[in-house]
Amino acid sequence: MSDADLTNAKSTSLACAKQVVETVPVLMRLIRSGVRSQGASISLPQLRVLGLLSRQPGASVSDVGIHLDVTTPTASALVDRMVKKSLVQRKEDPSERRRVILTLTAAGKDLLEDSRARAQSLVAHLLALETPEQLNKISEGLSLLADAAQAFQTSKKS
């Protein structure tokens, strides 16, 4: 690859990154406001915790804090509220007595599925006016972005 090709690729990469960084928050605000307006009975940080526990059953309160970028005491208070709502269950880790693991309850799973369905419905409504070709382009672009993010995360772990 020539220097000009590398410069062009970097410029294109930066332009694409700018577009992603500007678009994702707009979409997230739209989804959050839509989920809220449809009567969600949970805060967005709590919804994020449900998502984390769905992907990583047995996560700890510290894991929740890292995921939300909050202190462990803040995460613990949030989890306490979720336990009181019967959305999350705390259990002693059988392999490490001082560690508490978190799992979703049936009510937590149901609420997460309902919230995801609401969000998907909202996005489907947003995309309803697009042509099949545009929808394919959007889908392909999102798949490429998800693959790139996954590859980046994997490379950071090794």
Regions of interest found by a model, annotated:
Residues S11-T23, D114-S158:
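Terminal interaction helix/tail motif
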Residues M1-S41:
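N-terminal leader segment of winged-helix/HTH proteins
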Residues L30-T71, K85:
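N-terminal helix-turn-helix DNA-binding core of bacterial DNA-binding proteins
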